[in-house]
């Protein structure tokens, strides 16, 4: 959601920025920074990089076409059974946010059971705070708690102009089906182009990476990586 992904980016480069002091509303990704640095240094950008250099924006070009930003999430804190993450991908345009949750049966904010969290806290993706405690324990805030911690559908679609905080999911609304299908296809095309294993069917190893933090709950551990995954990802 925008609350976690829409962040400011400030760049200072006296020799490389034309008409400095500008504010650009172009959609960019962190993955665009590496090719920007390489291009600025006169180094060829490897084909494996999926980001696009920001040189056109820095040079003040007005016909820049950056119509979408792509977002991904896998595992953050170890707060689900077996150390699994919450795989999702998203596409953000100037008008819409479309999210694909690949395993909607998992808890997006972490399990409500302490035993599944490496830190032994409920909904471990959200750090402890008085606000979190009140939301979990006070019945009158049940709706807010569900928005923050509850399970989510396989697809989410939000109209930014009418819903800046992304609270009203339009993915199943008839009048937005064409928009949903178009954004779904754009996201799929990007994931295929970038070789994302969540879409290509290749082994997705994020759920099996080891955790290097001592668990507070006895017996907590990451699920072992399947043998076929180990063979598929041997480094040559």
Task: Write out the residue ranges for each language-model feature.
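Flexible loop/turn segments at secondary-structure boundaries
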Residues: 18-19, 78, 106-108, 166-167, ...
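Short intrinsically disordered coil segments
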Residues: 24-28, 112-119, 173-175
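Long, internal low-complexity/basic segments
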Residues: 138-155, 160-236
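Substrate-binding rim/cap in mid-to-C-terminal beta-strand-loop elements of soluble/periplasmic
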Residues: 1-48, 52-67, 150, 168
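C-terminal cap/loop subdomain of S1 sulfatases and analogous C-terminal strand-loop tails that border
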Residues: 41-156
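Active-site-proximal beta-strand/loop segments in catalytic clefts of secreted hydrolases
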Residues: 13-15, 73, 101-102, 161
């Amino acid at each position: 959601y925008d609350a976690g992904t829409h962040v400011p980016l400030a760049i200072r480069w006296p020799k490389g920025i034309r008409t400095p002091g500008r504010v650009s509303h172009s959609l960019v990704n962190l993955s665009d920074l590496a090719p920007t640095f390489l291009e600025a240094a006169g180094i060829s950008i490897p084909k494996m990089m999926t980001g696009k250099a920001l040189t056109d924006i820095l040079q003040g070009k007005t016909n820049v076409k950056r119509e979408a930003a792509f977002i991904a999430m896998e595992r953050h804190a170890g707060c689900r059974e077996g150390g699994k993450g919450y795989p999702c991908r998203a596409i953000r345009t100037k008008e819409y946010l479309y999210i694909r949750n690949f395993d909607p049966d998992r808890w997006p904010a972490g399990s409500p059971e302490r035993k599944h969290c490496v830190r032994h806290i409920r909904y471990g993706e959200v750090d402890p705070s008085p606000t979190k405690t009140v939301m979990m324990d006070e019945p009158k805030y049940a709706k807010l708690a569900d928005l923050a911690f509850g399970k989510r559908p396989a697809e989410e679609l939000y109209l930014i102009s009418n819903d800046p905080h992304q609270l009203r999911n339009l993915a199943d609304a008839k009048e937005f089906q064409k928009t949903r299908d178009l954004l779904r296809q754009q996201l799929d095309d990007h994931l295929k182009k970038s070789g994302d294993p969540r879409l290509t069917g290749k082994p997705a190893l994020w759920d099996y990476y080891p955790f290097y933090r001592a668990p507070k709950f006895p017996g907590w551990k990451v699920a072992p990586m399947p043998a076929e995954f180990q063979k598929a990802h041997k480094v040559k």
